[in-house]
Amino acid sequence: MSVTTPRRETSLLSRALRATAAAATAVVATVALAAPAQAANPYERGPNPTESMLEARSGPFSVSEERASRFGADGFGGGTIYYPRENNTYGAIAISPGYTGTQSSIAWLGERIASHGFVVIAIDTNTTLDQPDSRARQLNAALDYMLTDASSAVRNRIDASRLAVMGHSMGGGGTLRLASQRPDLKAAIPLTPWHLNKSWRDITVPTLIIGAEYDTIASVTLHSKPFYNSIPSPTDKAYLELDGASHFAPNITNKTIGMYSVAWLKRFVDEDTRYTQFLCPGPRTGLLSDVEEYRSTCPF
């Protein structure tokens, strides 16, 4: 018959305690390893980005369209809403055309951005001659329309806490104005912007300004660069100047505008740091590049 001595009992107890401690440590380690996955960005949408994916004419999401009738739109001239078909919630962006322009001049950008996981409205303004501050009010009205008056297919896909604006020319000026009035916006992207006001020191919204080297209507010397310089440095901001481009570069499909607009919106509307790699340090400039100049307040 086997007899267990007090010393052996102590040894067995020590082994049991060590085994329990080891098991507990393993559980803690497993939980710690799983924690990053559980704490993943809830706004992250789509696959890991690549340069070729961002340069393509469309992104990973299939897109549907909805017409916003001029007669049903309150405060702006109607437009077209582009949204991902996949059921989920997304940030929402309103885009304004420039002076004398219509939504057709920015339609390519609306559809392209939507294909990367956003709900986008490309608007018509009340008149094609509307000035920048009027366009700011209309961009704001368009955001409200998507949240309250669009179909349920659109409304149910929008995260109302993640809104942004874009615009070309005077629409870009309107974008700056609205960004100065609505600090709750997540991002602003003025495209070859025009505005008589040159100082935007009250903007705290992350802002990407895209200018054009050969713009003779809103020259970068008188518009884009002073706008960028006036935004206070604590604000996340970037300035990208298109090489050899004119004022109307945003009116036709442009891979550089598309790529960096999407990257900016992903980084700041979706808080998706996977896109920081395209903004910091940013694109190559100079010979054989589509970008004449790039500067920013990196790191973001």
Curated annotation (Swiss-Prot):
It holds the Pfam family PETase. Shows promising applications in ethyl alcohol distillery processes as it may be utilized for treatment of molasses wastewater. Has potential for application in biological recycling of plastic waste products. It is found in: Secreted; Periplasm. InterPro entries: AB_hydrolase_fold, FrsA_esterase, PET_hydrolase/cutinase-like. Keywords: Calcium, Disulfide bond, Hydrolase, Metal-binding, Periplasm, Secreted, Serine esterase, Signal. Optimum pH is 6. Can also bind other divalent metal ions with lower efficiency. Calcium ion binding contributes to the thermostability of the protein. Coiled coil: none annotated. One of its GO terms (molecular function) is cutinase activity. GO terms for cellular component: extracellular region; periplasmic space. Monomer. This is Cutinase est2.
